[in-house]
Amino acid sequence: MYKADSKIAEEFIDHQEILDTLEYAHNNKSNRALIEQLIDKAAQFKGLSHREAALLLECDQPDLTERIFRLAQEIKHKFYGNRIVMFAPLYLSNYCVNGCVYCPYHLKNKTIARKKLTQEEIRKEVIALQDMGHKRLALEAGEDPLRNPIEYILESIQTIYSIKHKNGAIPRVNVNIAATTVENYRKLKDAGIGTYILFQETYHKENYESLHPTGPKSKYAYHTEAMDRAMEAGIDDVGLGVLFGLNTYRYDFTGLLMHAEHLEATFGVGPHTISVPRICPADDISTQDFPDAISDDIFCKIVAVIRIAVPYTGMIISTRESAATRRKVLNLGISQISGGSRTSVGGYAIPETPEENSAQFDISDTRTLDEVVNWLLDLGHIPSFCTACYRAGRTGDRFMSLVKSGQIANCCAPNALMTLKEYLEDYAAPDTRAKGIQLIKKELEHIPNPKIKEIAIRNLKEIEEGKRDFRF
């Protein structure tokens, strides 16, 4: 039986509730009056239930679909403006004991090059990332209790935070590692992580078990209940996601929103972020083996409806997607993107040769960070390297209350401009710098609070003179 605030995976992700939701959406996909009513409700910026959102996703009326896209753009702008937070993944190790059939890290893969970074290698990778201009990392590692124990992850986090190269620093380390215990989540909390990220992959229990036949990850309930353990351990910010294409997208879309509702019902705060990766080619993995892979049009609609249903959450897209696809979804809901990414173990300090391939998946957007920043500036977005909320304790329910009230813009807008200015001064190519300076000048005029605007202008001037690390 469906129960949003249950601690049991099969109750807060209830299979029958998802089937009933999909039937409801299918039966009403041409019900203009009902769909218009839901669009009007969503325009109040309070979100939608999983059942209501499933109907918008299923809507087959072209003019109403266009209204859905316009509303998603409006909601994105209201809560996140034209700011796009930049980050990069750092893969520590691809040793893994699981048997996930869609991931080249799986235990039986004998063709992939296995690697694990030493602390000295991590130091070199972080310096390379800092020299690119990155301030925020997403730490990744395969699940291997012997080679990648929690102690290795904790030591790696400490190493990353300790490195200050030239004007560089990594003030926020988000962590994407396998489901673990409350005790280990407390250790991650004490290590000062930002967001704990864990993709569900698919919410369909039977399909999940067939995709994860062996290893610790094969335990559906333990994996699905991981965010509860993380939040019980005191981690304020958690990030959800599914790998679209492993199962029917309608099912996983609904399960994803039910998971968000569960966190809100149980802990009073929903997911800090939602990621929307799609299955893509990798070493010994072909997308042809996954018949549920989705088209660009469906992908864009998924992004738009998630933004409408969960207006407060950050939305992440990686370099799995091409530049063209990333451009489409920026206005529809995405608020964080990676740039200059490597999905190999390391690879920033010294790029891998083809023979050394250790990557988890193939990258579609191969541009450098500066090329991505330049592109965002051309599109009128503000590339943001801000980590202020985490450092000021604006996490969990405190962050969400600011987002839901719209007050977060008083912090985020000037912080984005100041961190962009730092990037322009320290790392940008001349053309990128010129474009960025013009955008900052334009965006300063949109800061409504005169006092904040005055302080921002003063700080920007001091950044030009060599000072760093200003924040509201």
Set out the residue ranges of the language-model regions:
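Radical SAM enzyme core and accessory elements
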Residues: 1-37, 41, 327-335, 341-472
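An N-cap/entry alpha-helix motif that binds or orients negatively charged groups
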Residues: 36, 40, 47-84
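Canonical Radical SAM [4Fe-4S] cluster-binding loop centered on the CxxxCxxC motif
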Residues: 80-121
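Generic structural signal for well-ordered alpha-helices
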Residues: 88, 126, 154-161, 185, ...
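Core AdoMet radical
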Residues: 107-124, 128-231, 237-240, 244-246, ...
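Conserved C-terminal portion of the radical SAM core fold
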Residues: 141, 195, 200, 221-285, ...
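Short glycine-enriched, charge-decorated loop/helix-capping segments at active-site entrances
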Residues: 211-217, 288-292, 358
